[in-house]
């Protein structure tokens, strides 16, 4: 019985990326083009997290609404499309890749600051968010690799690979790549 409890705890922990201590200092890009953030982005890869645990075929739509954007995040679970909606806007100088997000899911509104760690402002974004847990004295990392297409190619792919190789924050071994197969993306009516 104890073995099953330990196994369940290990499985639950592996669904997220946790570290001891405070969130690391990260430096967002300083050449961010907020206007190019708008539109559709495919979730090519991410750190596993319990909110998106079973989701496949993930993508986000950012629709301008004044100085902010409406955020709609979608994914498919067992043939059903799910979405989370909210708003986002730049934190401070819009050239700095720091974006405030306010999203509601599961009846709860969550707020975070998404740090753009790398982007070419056209084809890809590597984003990072950290959540500190005071009780556990540790933090959970969230990482997303977003692309304008379902597959990174050419210069965008090379730039992402080069960033991941040299990143002191993102562990590429922990990234889970999205399934965009016809079966994964199929929505049953």
From Swiss-Prot:
Hemolymph. Residues 1-15 form the signal peptide. One of its GO terms (cellular component) is cytoplasm. This is Bilin-binding protein. It comes from Pieris brassicae. Belongs to the calycin superfamily. Lipocalin family. GO terms for biological process: lipid metabolic process; response to reactive oxygen species. Disulfide bonds join 23-130, 57-185. SUPFAM superfamilies: Lipocalins. This protein binds the blue pigments bilins. Its main location: secreted. GO terms for molecular function: pigment binding. Keywords: Bile pigment, Chromophore, Disulfide bond, Pigment, Secreted, Signal. PANTHER family: APOLIPOPROTEIN D. It is found in: Secreted. The keyword Secreted applies. Homotetramer. The keyword Signal applies.
């Amino acid at each position: 019985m104890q073995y099953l409890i330990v196994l369940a705890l290990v499985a639950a922990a592996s669904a997220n990326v946790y570290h001891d201590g405070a969130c690391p200092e990260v430096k967002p890009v300083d050449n961010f083009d907020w206007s190019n953030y708008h539109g559709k982005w495919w979730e090519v890869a991410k750190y596993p997290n319990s909110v998106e645990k079973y989701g496949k075929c993930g993508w986000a739509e950012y629709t301008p609404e004044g100085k902010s954007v409406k955020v709609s995040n979608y994914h498919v679970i067992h043939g059903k499309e799910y979405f989370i909606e909210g708003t986002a806007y730049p934190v401070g100088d819009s050239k700095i890749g720091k974006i405030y997000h306010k999203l509601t899911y599961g009846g709860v509104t969550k707020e975070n600051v998404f740090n753009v760690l790398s982007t070419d402002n056209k084809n890809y974004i590597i984003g990072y968010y950290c959540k500190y847990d005071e009780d556990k004295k540790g933090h959970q990392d969230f990482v997303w690799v977003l692309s304008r297409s379902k597959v990174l190619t050419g210069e965008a792919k090379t730039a992402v690979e080069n960033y991941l190789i040299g990143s002191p924050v993102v562990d590429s071994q922990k990234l889970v790549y999205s399934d965009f197969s016809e079966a994964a993306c199929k929505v049953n009516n």
